[in-house]
Amino acid sequence: MLEKKTIAELDPVLWDAMQNEVRRQEEHIELIASENYVTPAVMQAQGSQLTNKYAEGYPGKRYYGGCEYVDIVEQLAIDRAKELFGAEYANVQPHSGSQANAAVYGALLSAGDTILGMDLAHGGHLTHGAKVSFSGKIYNSVLYGITADGVIDYADVRTKALESKPKMIVAGFSAYSQVIDWAKMREIADEVDAYLFVDMAHVAGLIAAGLYPNPLPHAHVVTTTTHKTLAGPRGGLILSACGDEDIYKKLNSSVFPANQGGPLMHVIAAKAVCFKEALEPSFKVYQAQVLKNAKAMVEVFKQRGFDVVSNGTENHLFLVSFIKQGLTGKQADAALGAANITVNKNSVPNDPQKPFVTSGIRVGSPSITRRGFSETDAATLAGWMCDVLESIGKDNHEQVIAETKTKVLDICKRLPVYGIGR
């Protein structure tokens, strides 16, 4: 018999944890750059009966019967993704960004091939060749970084490309606040006859809104997550406009059957919702405010004497270095967390601390903007953060945290996420 109890009735312990998370999201300010708040429509799709359906294969070419309606769902997601980013090809099945990246490598590389990617310590991602990742174990990874000014060292990229002759150059980041010159990266890739693969996960929403350069005209393949600035469900997406049907076929085969089995149709439906939302004019307004809020926060940190890596931001995130202050990212993370402000500790260039400690934090504006924060609100918040950070190690530290927490709760009440659970 089909059990029809609610979670609260069936599993009170789990329900209590879920409700506490709802309250945490309502009563804490979220500044983790890779997080965002999805709409009720996205959640409705993810909680639908589509979760019941197995659909190995692709629309019109399934290994299971009864897929006539999920075919419509997936094709909607594919078509909307193409329209949103100007792509010729889209695969909406990857379960995550890392899975999407693994599929790209599997499609175009062989084990032992050389890839040239951005150093994790300089703002890259684990899957761009870090030695602790599959990308640095299966493939021979060479890493490039940023200059003392905090911008990508294209001369270094070119030199290392000429020396290592990679089969693929990986562009993209998890903690880089400036604009990447996609055309320059393609020029370097062409010089060594390499594929250019772009991971635009962090800036996909800005790109969709036309506020950050689109890599599709330059890259052979592009991947992204569907959350972060895109504000959709957790998942991955592969795109291309290279015009090479052979590459498209290899990418499809690398996702299924090589890396994954059945797609998550409820998540694909949520992706379709997310892409439709991103095609609305209001999405561009939102993304423009994301940029304004990030820049407003940067100015406050600089005015208060903190070092901002790259001296600013041209997207939704920025890094604050505490090397000068002698603080660690772990200390800052904990202190801000006690005041209901959630950030993540992050390594910064020339960081003397270990990765689990770090000397900096990463700050992102997508979630606060989703709540309705203006530039004034964002600047005020940055000031509160500076108050907390400056009080670390001082006698008034606990008092500052308590006062800041009260202010945070007040603004969260004024600008709720969903307005439930408090």
UniProtKB/Swiss-Prot annotation:
Keyword terms: Amino-acid biosynthesis, Cytoplasm, One-carbon metabolism, Pyridoxal phosphate, Transferase
Pathway noted in the entry: One-carbon metabolism; tetrahydrofolate interconversion; Amino-acid biosynthesis; glycine biosynthesis; glycine from L-serine: step 1/1
Localization annotation: Cytoplasm
Family annotation (SUPFAM superfamilies): PLP-dependent transferases
Enzyme Commission number(s) of this protein: 2.1.2.1
Residues forming coiled coils: none
Cofactors: pyridoxal 5'-phosphate
A GO term for molecular function: pyridoxal phosphate binding
Known catalytic reactions: (6R)-5,10-methylene-5,6,7,8-tetrahydrofolate + glycine + H2O = (6S)-5,6,7,8-tetrahydrofolate + L-serine
Organism superkingdom: Bacteria
Positions bound to (6S)-5,6,7,8-tetrahydrofolate: 120, 124-126
Modification N6-(pyridoxal phosphate)lysine, positions: 228
Record-annotated site: Plays an important role in substrate specificity: 227
InterPro entries, sorted: PyrdxlP-dep_Trfase, PyrdxlP-dep_Trfase_major, PyrdxlP-dep_Trfase_small, Ser_HO-MeTrfase, Ser_HO-MeTrfase-like, Ser_HO-MeTrfase_PLP_BS, SHMT-like_dom
Annotated GO biological process: glycine biosynthetic process from serine; tetrahydrofolate interconversion
GO cellular component: cytosol
Protein family per UniProt: Belongs to the SHMT family.
Subunit annotation: Homodimer.
Purpose of the protein: Catalyzes the reversible interconversion of serine and glycine with tetrahydrofolate (THF) serving as the one-carbon carrier. This reaction serves as the major source of one-carbon groups required for the biosynthesis of purines, thymidylate, methionine, and other important biomolecules. Also exhibits THF-independent aldolase activity toward beta-hydroxyamino acids, producing glycine and aldehydes, via a retro-aldol mechanism.
Protein name per UniProt: Serine hydroxymethyltransferase
Organism encoding this protein: Actinobacillus succinogenes (strain ATCC 55618 / DSM 22257 / CCUG 43843 / 130Z)
Gene (name only): glyA
